[in-house]
Amino acid sequence: MEGSSNSPDRQSSGGSPPEERGGGGSGGGGGRSAAGEPVRSRWTPKPEQILILESIFNSGMVNPPKDETVRIRKLLERFGAVGDANVFYWFQNRRSRSRRRQRQMQAAAAAAAAAASSSSPSANTSPAAASAATVQVGLPPGAVVHTMAMGGSACQYEQQASSSSSSGSTGGSSLGLFAHGAGASGAGGYLQASCGASASASSALAPGLMGDVVDSGGSDDLFAISRQMGFVGSPRCSPASSPATPSSAATAAQQQFYSCQLPAATITVFINGVPMEMPRGPIDLRAMFGQDVMLVHSTGALLPVNDYGILMQSLQIGESYFLVARPP
């Protein structure tokens, strides 16, 4: 009778296989479990523990090895009792849920693709393709029109063969944003970006943009490419106010190019599984998140702070962190 009365307790004690294999004996097994550590109910992680586990899983560690499991368990023990087996089975169940959700998303995507393919073919024509078809009207023979996305809008650029005598001239409504220099004695090619600019603006800008590449003799000039990418001058200056000499124009463009290469002031990191823009360098953790919190890396390492609540090391781009409350 004693063994049968203890059997339900063993079946509801967390579901670990060692306890279930040990519970098939007689009443002596129940006596050992009663004499040792009391059998607890199924482990229910606390919100802080769930947050830590989810952050570690989302960082890419979906199947931690044994030593990492021990580290995670020690980190979770700050907020409640937990064992290595609990951590192991949590990651096992989380992987199963993730795979099941991925299969459901793939099935939904396949159904949506099948529904889209069964619709009328005329609906598949995109606005960019339609605009490309309109730009092709009036192009010279041999011109190839491509579609290119720039700044959220669709632009087309034509690749046109040209000789050294005609490489400096451009179309009436084209801006030479990308160019490949033509040799002094051979034929070359350049790319003209047709972004809907007016004829007057393009006629003023195109010679300055293409002249640097033609003068370079076909060599790869990084500063000329940077000037063609939009670093010709200040946006407030008109094209007519640019210097007349190529050397002074090149110097001004180089200075403008280097002045635009400042590092980003913020970086993107994941905090509690949410992408956030954080300042680069030292961070005032107390002023940003409060007094009683600490920042932990997804590997379980606690980020050190000084006496004033300032992080001693900078956050890394793309890394995953999570905020946890300090234990009382």
Curated annotation (Swiss-Prot):
InterPro entries attached here? HD (IPR001356), Homeodomain-like_sf (IPR009057), WOX11-like (IPR044558)
Q: Where is this region: Disordered?
A: 1-45
Give a GO cellular-component term: nucleus
> By its UniProt entry, which Pfam families does this protein fall under?
Homeodomain
> GO:BP terms for this protein?
adventitious root development
Which portions of the chain have biased composition (kind: Polar residues)? 1-11
Ranges annotated as DNA-binding: 38-102
TM regions (residue ranges): none
Q: What family does this belong to?
A: Belongs to the WUS homeobox family.
UniProt-recorded name of the protein: WUSCHEL-related homeobox 6
Ranked from the top, the taxonomy reads: Eukaryota, Viridiplantae, Streptophyta, Embryophyta, Tracheophyta
